[in-house]
Amino acid sequence: MSAHIILANFTDQGARAIKDSPERFEAFKALAEGAGITVKSVHWTTGAYDMVLVTEGPEEAAMTLNMKMASLGNVRTQTLRGYDAAEMRRMVGKLK
């Protein structure tokens, strides 16, 4: 399973319907769970991004979910692949 950090900004459409954002998140979470992805956390934020989500699941399922989220037109996203300490140790252990 891979960790993904999703940085999201509302589109104009999403901003106009911002009051529905918590319900849209619940729908996203249900869709994610149906695809085998766990939503570890969500935060509505100030600054450069409107939301930050952390998910965990298979790479292909995560990408498909991101495309589905984008196709709804409420947010634009940037997704980062995250590595935990054990994964990082394995990778740097190969630097011989």
Where do the PLM segments sit?
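A compositional/biophysical signature of low hydrophobicity enriched in polar/charged and small residues
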Residues: 1-96
